[in-house]
Amino acid sequence: MTAHKLGVHSETGTLRQVIICRPGLAHRRLTPENCEELLFDDVFWVKQAKQDHEAFGAAMTQEGVEVLETGALLGETLEIPEARKWVLDHRISANDVGVGMRKDLRDWMDELPGTELATWLIGGLTVGDVPFEATSMFGAYLGRHGFILPPLPNFLFTRDNSSWVYGGVTLNPMYWQARRPETLLTAAIYRYHPKFAGKVHEIWADPLKNHGLATLEGGDVMPVGNGLVLVGMGERTSPQGVGLMAQALFGEGRATRVIACQMPKSRAAMHLDTVFTFCGDNIVTSFKEVADEMTCYDLHPGEGDKPLDMRHDTRPMFEVVAEAMGFKKLNVVPTGGSDPFEQSREQWNDGNNVLALRPGVVMGYDRNDDTNAALRAEGIKVIELPGAELGRGRGGSRCMSCPTIRDAV
């Protein structure tokens, strides 16, 4: 057990503790017919994806990182009666499962072991899974293989539903409805699990409220150190969400400056960390085709009745970020090296979505040969993990990890 306090104080400082989520039932329920609705482009060979994900966790453990797993944490959390009641009160509501099925479903779930309940909440629940006759209108409408609770395959990407920013955490209101239950379940872990209960400071936002157009996802959030936070605004994170998060951070003195980076709204660039990540010191890897077109909004605490002071900075993003971090310039390693075809291919395969374990040491998919070679040429150690199956989810090692303890640099 680590003795360090919860908090993420940089992008590349020594990683002490991280949460990941293994592939499982939710991914076995992905089909060519439903994968788009569930925000996947393809289906996994789940057996291989599980083995590759185990290798991901084992590699971090070998490097001294304490690796926690979402399903296990949730199962342990649900053994706590107060936590189980809180989760089921909000997950098994008439709005979600209909008036006719709610009581039977709740009575059954109240008696399940925590681990099994966690499996259904993450993996999804069909009419055929329940031990009672689902004779309600909702049950009849769904049919035997219809989802009472849809699966949450994107929980694999633990980065997104919460963001640790310096000494606190945001519980993120996610863009797509298919992902929003992830935030509720993660909030339960933070509020009730013995490893987190009483030690977590929630900065923003309440997972039980409707936040309207204010959306935020962790792949867009980078606490880079010294009170500076970079945030992407693209497909998943809105200006409204960035403004509210910045206001909350400034109000508590947890950040002094937020640079919001405007991105194109595209699947290939859904988050900031799909086009730009830090590797150590001033070295970054980036898909320059997108990054070179991004512009920045510089946010500081406002004065008087003005909640935020905002300036639109039209300089290139790399110049803005370098200056804000105190560097003369950033050493930008292009995704895919110098070949434009490989640049496009390797960006699609998360070539620049790397996770720093400490300054100069990152994890990335083995399939991105040119990106990894270019990083090594700049002195970065790349620990490769198998990406043939996991890469089908369109998320790399940074996407698949939620750091909860990371040192400053």
UniProtKB/Swiss-Prot annotation:
It holds the Pfam family ADI. The keyword Nucleus does not apply. The active site is at 399 (amidino-cysteine intermediate). SUPFAM superfamilies: Pentein. Its EC number is 3.5.3.6. Pathway: Amino-acid degradation; L-arginine degradation via ADI pathway; carbamoyl phosphate from L-arginine: step 1/2. One of its GO terms (cellular component) is cytoplasm. One of its GO terms (molecular function) is arginine deiminase activity. It is found in: Cytoplasm. GO terms for biological process: arginine catabolic process to ornithine; arginine deiminase pathway. Keywords: Arginine metabolism, Cytoplasm, Hydrolase. It catalyses: L-arginine + H2O = L-citrulline + NH4(+). Belongs to the arginine deiminase family. PANTHER family: ARGININE DEIMINASE (PTHR47271:SF3). This is Arginine deiminase. It comes from Dinoroseobacter shibae (strain DSM 16493 / NCIMB 14021 / DFL 12).
